[in-house]
């Protein structure tokens, strides 16, 4: 694949669009989009493939803008009056027993010609007494493409659409037109909101930014990365895990692991919370859940991260459960099970994995626990993990030569990762607090940067440890360990 040719075609498409030659611009855009699509199929590196897909998406948006401009210009050439809303208030009262005046002959619709290959029903007008009638206007036959669609028709279309057809649309996008998620059957605002607020790219958190947790990293690589590298191996009984649940006390790195998955694995990352799938309208939340999973299958390979999943799918059958929340839970369970069933014999590189995190695993519904096949414990950092966390948090700060991070790691035993970060942050501010003590605001503003860049000492950590205590109790740790002994699946 000639990369220079791709760049040249993209440049020509943009130049023709700026000059107003939209037809030539659309031809170049279609060609470069097809070239990038073929190039992505030959790329094996997930990171490089993700960057090419992002470039392809940007060109696709430009192509859609040019296409909308062309359609707008074409609409000016059509001899058709604009459709204005009919105002019934200006119409005087009409007796229903009296027929309205006939439509002028020059405004009548042309007679429809019956063709032998298809049936066309003639346009019928109800001229009987029917209450108020709008002002007399030009009548047009309603073609098949202009037929108004009702909500019932949209629901039928959405219900009849299957995931395999959607996947073929994505893979077979050789014509350059079917390159974006088709939200037919759903509200356009819902689709745009999910694409704008949920799809996250490049959170800039890497595996090296997370200390310890080697078992969790290994499992996530096995569940997300390896199926993309070895698609022929992960088939049948070796199919990828469709659900992973991370359990542990607050501040141990569950959300950071999810961000690292989004950065390192090169998959589309959906970050879902309870507010994302909540709507005040009846039945809207269930549609959001279904739309989320359909978009995930379309943009596969995809990782759906549901943080604090106990707030969305808590135990069913309790006395304080609302009917609406029960319907949302049922739809979520159906879609999660459908993910595995739809992709069981498919290409593992087109997988959809649900990655969940919770601090209250004992409140999760039993059916959801079964669908989350891997349930791993994210514990408090070990002695080595605490030392690594100190090094990561203090890598941009100057340290005193006499300070020993191993000694500090022993003092912060029982602290979570978030607690250790707070200790490092507070200790790094101690020198600045001592320097500005007793100074006026003018004197503080006059201080140079070098005067504030003082090394962090062991005494600074001692003062910070006196102010900051651990946030996880021993009783909580016992509850997590007991639950993992009973339901863990690492």
Swiss-Prot record:
EC number(s) recorded for this UniProt protein: 5.6.1.1
Keywords associated with the record: Acetylation, ATP-binding, Cytoplasm, Cytoskeleton, Isomerase, Microtubule, Nucleotide-binding, Phosphoprotein
GO CC terms: centrosome; cytoplasm; microtubule; spindle; spindle pole
Protein location: Cytoplasm, Cytoskeleton; Cytoplasm; Cytoplasm, Cytoskeleton, Spindle pole; Cytoplasm, Cytoskeleton, Spindle
Compositional bias ranges of the Low complexity kind: 128-139
Annotated positions binding ATP: 248-255
Gene3D superfamilies tied to this protein: 1.10.8.60, P-loop containing nucleotide triphosphate hydrolases, Phosphotransferase system, lactose/cellobiose-type IIA subunit
Region (Disordered): 95-178
Main EC class the enzyme belongs to: isomerase
Pfam families: AAA, AAA_lid_3, KATNA1_MIT, Vps4_C
Reactions the enzyme catalyzes: n ATP + n H2O + a microtubule = n ADP + n phosphate + (n+1) alpha/beta tubulin heterodimers
Record-level GO BP terms: microtubule severing; spermatogenesis
InterPro entries given in the database record: AAA+_ATPase, AAA_lid_3, ATPase_AAA_core, ATPase_AAA_CS, KATNA1, KATNA1_MIT, Katnal1_chordates, KTNA1_AAA_dom
Source superkingdom: Eukaryota
Recorded GO MF terms: ATP binding; ATP hydrolysis activity; microtubule binding; microtubule severing ATPase activity
Modified residues (Phosphoserine): 174
Residues bearing PTM N-acetylmethionine: 1
Chain intervals with Basic and acidic residues compositional bias: 116-127, 143-169
Cytoplasm recorded as keyword: yes
Subunit structure: Interacts with KATNB1 and KATNBL1.
Function noted in UniProt: Regulates microtubule dynamics in Sertoli cells, a process that is essential for spermiogenesis and male fertility. Severs microtubules in an ATP-dependent manner, promoting rapid reorganization of cellular microtubule arrays. Has microtubule-severing activity in vitro.
Assigned protein family: Belongs to the AAA ATPase family. Katanin p60 subunit A1 subfamily. A-like 1 sub-subfamily.
Name of the protein: Katanin p60 ATPase-containing subunit A-like 1
